[in-house]
Amino acid sequence: MNTMTYSVDATAILNELVQRSITQLCHFTTFGNVRSIFKMGALYSRQTLEELRVPADFQDPLRCDGARYINLSIHEVNFRLLSKFAYDQPYAEWCILRLRKEICMRTGVRFTTDNAAAGQVRQYGTAEGVFGLKALFAASVPAKAGCVTRKANKPMNLPTSPQAEVLCPEPIALRDVMDVMVVNWEAKQRLVNKYGIPEALVKVGERCFPSMLRCRSYEGAVMD
């Protein structure tokens, strides 16, 4: 495993995060996946999990360039993307890993103004360093549908496009996980008692989730 190093402009990146009141990065996943994350002691890319034959529900795209990144969002999850996966997997329970913002300061971290699997990203590429981070908050950014214009009332800690991502080279250690958010108290009990996640790390935050997950019932559902 490579020793973690920091970007040459790590200080500038941290200053930008602080000035924008960005307190966390987010990564949504299923209860089954988060159990594997805690067993392995880190988050790994889809490529590595497939090579190790670790059972997982994959949300991150399989990158054709061979790069091993973990897809993260800034300050809150991508509601649209989480809703899509939740619709496609109606019996899966979802949680959100809230990660330390300092991950953005690491060497090799890249920033993209749109979802990493989108054609616009392949066309316009990604960027590293404070330049790449600032680009996420531009007045107008390229996106799948053309361009996304920043709304006047957009909170300063949210990127112009909700599809923006932070691509972090694997692994992300458990020490960078601040907490694990779930949609309600019952979900917390299941994640702690059935999946073995430490209770002190699991927090309830209904507003962190899209509306379709706030009202979903898992009573009688078949889960792993």
Each predicted region: which residue ranges?
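Active-site-proximal loop/hinge segments that shape catalytic or ion-binding/gating pockets
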Residues: 2-71, 78-224
